[in-house]
Design a protein with these regions (language model features):
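Surface-exposed, glycine-biased beta-strand/turn segments
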Residues: 1-57
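Residue-level recognition of beta-strand microenvironments
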Residues: 20, 51-52, 79, 96-99, ...
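Conserved beta-strand positions that form and line the central face of beta-propeller blades
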Residues: 31, 62, 72, 95, ...
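Short, well-structured beta-strand-loop connectors
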Residues: 39-48, 81-96
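Zn2+-dependent peptidoglycan hydrolase active-site motif and core
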Residues: 43-80, 106-107
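Conserved, short, structured surface segments that act as functional micro-motifs
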Residues: 85-128
Length: 128
């Protein structure tokens, strides 16, 4: 198993990061502004383990990758994969949106978790 630091991760979308990772304020990911309907892609090969609507974060997808890594994609306008689906790095999994009560505009909220610990995605991925 290759360490995360040595693994190429696809950016889920390209765009401007408008809200950065901050554990102190419980923002466990980054917000990336993009256009409604832009394609959201998987950062690595993996299996979809959650693909549902939630009141707070709208249409959400979670993908389990090797090395105990989970990627999370929130506020989508549409989910394109079902739970149990195997995806490859770069596969389109959802479309950017503004769904859920916690959304403040069209963007993707993106998180990375390793063994239950949130990681700062900007340490591993260039979004611009």
């Amino acid at each position: 198993n290759t360490p995360i630091e040595l693994t190429f991760l696809f950016p889920p979308i390209k765009g401007l990061v408008t809200s950065r990772f901050g554990e102190s304020r419980e923002h466990f990911g980054v917000d990336i502004v993009s256009s409604e309907g832009d394609r959201v892609v998987s950062i690595l090969d993996g299996t979809v383990i959650f693909a549902e609507w939630t009141i707070e974060t709208g249409y959400v997808v979670h993908i389990q990758h090797d090395n105990h890594l989970i990627s999370v994609y929130k506020h989508n306008s549409k989910i394109l994969k079902r739970v149990g689906t195997r995806v490859l790095a770069g596969d389109v999994i959802a479309l950017v949106g503004n769904s859920g009560e916690h959304s403040t505009g069209t963007h993707l909220h993106f998180e990375m978790w390793h063994k239950g610990v949130p990681l700062n995605p900007e340490n591993y991925i260039s979004f611009e």
